[in-house]
Amino acid sequence: SFIDVLLFMQLYPKIVVITSDWVWKFPLFAFTLRYAGYFPSNNGYDKLSSDLLSMVNDGYSVLIFPEGTRSYDENILRFHKGAFYLSEKLKLDILPVAIYGAGLVLSKQQNFYLKPGCVTYEFLPRIAYDNNSFGETYQEKSKSVRRLIIDKYNSLFEEFATPANKYYREKLIYNY
């Protein structure tokens, strides 16, 4: 979601984002993304690789959401393999991030209605591009990293899916 992109931009300003194609259909978003130097994923990763490598050499990090879209039900979707392909092709490490709560406070069904709640990001250990413990191919790495993120997401769920989280507190009060 665009809330994820905004939060990541606050963490590290030298970031280039590969976004889903649908975001570019909204004129305001498209203008902002183009101005920021972001890329739509429909350009194809082979076409983007030289531009991305140039930006990485200038100190930028590449941000890709491998699910490609948000989930309707908070379950982590299958990962597309483009991020892992780029990691292998451009020799870039992967920094997996588990995000909990963004889909609750800004659900896919109510795209522009921000609800109160807690959003947390957990950065997992960096994976070197040549680390084969997650798989020999980028396809295998995609599946292994997805499992790693699901495990972390589940632990974040255990920690934050309580009445102390404003999102759940509001739901609890609303239901009684």
Please name every model-derived segment.
Residues 1-44:
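Catalytic core of membrane glycerolipid acyltransferases/transacylases, capturing the structured
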Residues 10, 46-176:
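Non-catalytic C-terminal accessory region of glycerolipid acyltransferases
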